[in-house]
Design a protein with these regions (language model features):
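Surface-exposed interfaces of beta-sheet-rich extracellular modules
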Residues: 1-22
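Extracellular/surface recognition and adhesion modules
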Residues: 8-11, 34, 112, 170
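Extracellular interaction modules
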Residues: 16-38, 104-108, 228-232
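Feature responds to low-complexity, polar/acidic, surface-exposed segments characteristic
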Residues: 37-106, 115-135, 143-165, 177-192, ...
Length: 266
């Protein structure tokens, strides 16, 4: 089971969640109870400051259904690091032959590799311009977490996959979901909308409805209200102050100036 903003802790025999079940023998109808706890933000990531981490293109589009490259993914998570973590691990030496010193993504890839969060295609290549897969993206998210997966995955297509344990952990934390038919599609490229949705879950950046946003925010002609990804895109592309709305959701309280990330692209 998946619940946005929560980690699944297991099945229990009682409503007070004191008797955890590992196996159950069905001889009659039984009621079991799902255990949940709010998922915290990983220690290396900045979940407190809700700044824009996605930038649209020069034509004014955010391209929610386009793929995300491996370099772009490294840059996104580089921006989302806590400042002290980013400065401690900051480097422009990646060890990858295809990540050139003058490339705009060099510091991002190099720093994230130094953290052990991103991996190469081979020992000495990163393939920065290749579209990142759903499995690769889930694995990056899971590497920020220090826990281990508990129980079997509900996905039908990840058994034996190189990222099976990372996918299972990301699912347990409520960060990723599969198709209605139970597939995760690990080798399919992830879209920008899917990536933003997952990142917002990782960071607990979750407006519940359009009324939680503010007038005057940046909006996009290719991410209109009514699209399943509308809230995720708005959250990812607008810097804002916020107030908590219950245990998981948020309500914006002010719009802020977006950070200038160009200093790390030189």
């Amino acid at each position: 089971p998946v619940r946005e903003g929560y980690t699944f802790t297991g099945w229990y025999a009682d409503k007070d969640l004191t008797e955890k079940i590992s196996t159950i023998k069905m001889t009659s109808n039984k009621t079991v109870y799902a255990g949940w706890e709010a998922t915290g933000v990983p220690d290396w990531l900045n979940g407190a400051d809700h700044f824009a981490y996605i930038i649209g293109d020069d034509e004014g589009y955010v391209r929610p259904l386009a793929n995300v490259t491996r370099a772009e993914t490294a840059a996104i998570f580089f921006r989302l690091l806590k400042e002290d973590v980013r400065e401690e691990y900051l480097t422009d030496r990646s060890g990858f032959a295809d990540v050139e010193q003058g490339a705009w993504y060099n510091k991002a890839v190099s720093t994230m590799a130094a953290l052990g969060v991103v991996k190469g295609y081979t020992e000495d290549t990163f393939a920065p311009h290749e579209a990142i897969t759903r499995a690769e993206f889930a694995a990056i998210c899971a590497r920020f977490d220090t826990g281990t997966s508990d129980g079997e995955s509900s996905f039908t297509d990840i058994s034996g996959h190189w990222a099976e344990s990372e996918i299972r952990r990301a699912a347990q934390l409520g960060w990723i979901q599969g198709d209605p038919d139970g597939r995760f599609r690990p080798n399919a490229p992830i879209t920008r909308a899917e990536a933003m949705t997952i990142i917002n879950r990782v960071l607990n950046r979750l407006p519940e409805e359009k009324e939680d946003l503010l007038e005057g925010m940046k909006e996009w002609p290719d991410a209109l209200p009514g699209a399943w990804y509308y809230l995720a895109v708005q959250e990812a592309t607008n810097s804002h102050a916020y107030e908590r709305k219950g245990e998981v959701y948020e309500r914006w309280s002010a719009l802020n100036v977006n950070p200038d990330w160009a200093q790390y692209q030189r």
